[in-house]
Amino acid sequence: MWGLCKNHFPSNKIQVQERNKALKPKKSGSEHKTKQLFPVFNCKKKEKGVMIRFAILRNANTSLLSARSICLFTQAPTYCHVRLNTLNKSITTKRNSLTESKRHVHDGKHFFTTPHQQQQTKLGEIEEGHSPNIKGEDLRSIGQAITHQRNKRRKQIWSAIFGGIFGVILGYSLIYRVIYLKEQSFLPLFPSSKIRKLSTRDLKKVDVNQVQKLSKLRVLEILSGHDMIKEQYGVPLLDKDGNSPTLNEFSMWCEDQDPCVTGIVMEPDDKRDSSHTWYRIPFVCKWRITHRPISIRGTIDDLLNRIGLETADLFEIISPERVYGSFKYEYPLQGDSHALHLWFHGEIELDDDSLIVYNGKYHVDVKLQEIDLFRREKNGQLIQYVLYKNEAGDK
């Protein structure tokens, strides 16, 4: 019998027998007997249903319930269908797992945000109707965030380095040397010029008036023997009023022989009187700002003495000639372990258009370095005449 299970099925025994007679094919006897004994099921896929071919014994009593059971059995999925569905499900599961794993991969783009949050932001903007250049804005914001984080990290590292160095130096200078050892400590801050003005304490040790008088006498002595001064101004040298020339300006300063630094001197707070002006931290220390030279030779000697050596063990220093004007015979300030050059500068006015300018050094006696005459000529030009210069002097 040929029947379409989806659309039609025989409802009684008589219709089944008549249908079998009409559709009975003419075949050999052996083949016909075999098909009467064993029903044959052959499934073919079509667009609207499944065509089922089955044979039923002519004398068999088949009820409607049994026929419907046969139809339902034939419509059940075959092994091929089950296998195909299993493969499709496994492939779909693998694809979903790969997609989920890719979502959780942390790359440089999602350094501060997760892909899930970024996807929600994009969906929200699209739903609201906004369509900006999301990719460019994200890249710029991420780049700015990374740059800000690097700069912040760099500042933290440098702050830690400088803070550690400052803490070590301050701890050694203040806590160890001043508080523990009860000694004076010097903390250098920045380099300073070797030339500086005399402090109030230094001026107390130098007789400025004596230097001023001696320098004026030495200048007048040299000018009186100069040919140009004899011819144009005469001897003895007088000013425009016919009196002895007077000093219009005189100043002094000092020059260290070694490089100098400006720093802080700290001592224990012993409340003793001192000629310096101190700032006090009660019960801790007192401090002031001062200038100090850096003696390279003295530093080397100190390092060698700490390891049990002396300078003479490594090299021999031959002292230069004791020539007047060298640092060997310069003016040492009391309480200082280094020598200083004491320089002076003065001006003497001869008339309205002539001015004598000189400078030199002082050590027990005055030593002039240079004497110049500044004169305004009739054509209005200001000309400098070098009247005296000590070529052997050290400036």
Curated annotation (Swiss-Prot):
Coiled-coil regions listed in the entry: none
Membrane topology: Single-pass membrane protein
GO CC entries: mitochondrial membrane
Keywords: Membrane, Mitochondrion, Transit peptide, Transmembrane, Transmembrane helix
Highest taxon listed in the record's lineage: Eukaryota
Annotated localization: Mitochondrion membrane
Residues that span the membrane, as ranges: 156-176
Family of the protein in this entry: Belongs to the AIM39 family.
Name assigned to this protein: Altered inheritance of mitochondria protein 39, mitochondrial
